[in-house]
Amino acid sequence: SEKPPALFDLTSLQREANRQLGFTAQQTLDYTQALYEKKLVTYPRTDSRYLTDDMAPLVPELVSVIQQSFQIQADVPAPVNAAQVINSKKVTDHHAIIPTKTAAGYDISSLPSGEQAILTLLAVRLICAVGTPCHYAETIVEAECAGQKFRTKGKTVTDMGWRQYAGKPVEDAEKNAEAGDLPELCLLYTS
């Protein structure tokens, strides 16, 4: 199984924004700072990937309003396991970067495209981080022929879990799983 990803701190947000969107670290910081000044995200200059214990009761409602506002698989209510993202001991000055309730009621289309992209990245990560694990079934086949050993393995997704809310990474997981699917096996010859 694959655990849900952690929430973003500034460094992990910058890495992901570079990987997915091609933004530089400075661009990501600038967009996130602008969103913070509009009260759409929490404080961006943080090194924590967790929320504080006192935020636990707020997480389910925040996830629900963010999921609806951003239309993140809105027809499938996201499961919320807030305990995965709550750990006051791992929070120093500021908790992880997350969207605020203000973001849920905001006309996101009025934002510049870079800010929209970062806000959406943060919204999707919040939904994924509190989700259930993604489960796979794996098959390994080993065979020997003419003294040569062959081995192959394939993976099939049995429960998408948090990945069903992740957008493009879901398609990648499905494509990878399909590429690794093994056909039904039958024994044709033994010596």
Predicted features along the sequence, with ranges:
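Accessory interaction regions appended to the cores of large information-processing enzymes
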Residues: 40, 80, 93, 145-147
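Residues in well-ordered beta-strands of folded domains
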Residues: 42-44, 62-65, 98-100, 142-144, ...
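Alpha-helical structural motif
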Residues: 55-62, 89, 93, 115-118
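Leucine-rich, amphipathic alpha-helical/linker segments
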Residues: 76-92
